Amino acid sequence: MKINGFTLLEMLLVLTISFTLITLTIFPISSTLSTLREKQLLEEIKASIYYAQINAVATNQDTFISFGPTKNQLITYTNSKTLVIIPLSQTLTLTQPKIGNFRFSSTDGSINRFSTIHLTSSTNNYKLIFQIGKGRFRIEQN
């Protein structure tokens, strides 16, 4: 005789279905979060490079970008102060042993040399490509 209640079998069935659905949704969320962290860091790198270029023209000082493979970070600075430091260690890794500095000219914001910088994550490889001339760059996913 059942009066306004559920049997143990019905409760176990509902709990099993609920836990199965929860488990199936957690794994895609974790991979989505790591992808979002990568994209956010790449956008932050883009923004800091644009900021360095704009700062060079606005303050009439040469601005430098330095990628440090040993500390795995990006630093933008002028002769007098550090503008931005972005640590890459949690999400992206620089794969080249020596990269060097890039300089944005104070007259027109052009960059002094062209190069490709390789970044790797747990799932993707990226190339940060600096083009010679007006300081243009792009990020490509391999």
Spans of model-derived segments:
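Phosphate-interacting basic helix/loop segments used at nucleotide- and nucleic-acid interfaces
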Residues: 46-51
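Membrane-proximal amphipathic alpha-helices
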Residues: 34-45
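N-terminal single-pass transmembrane signal-anchor helix
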Residues: 1-29
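N-terminal helix-rich module
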Residues: 24, 28-31, 39, 54, ...
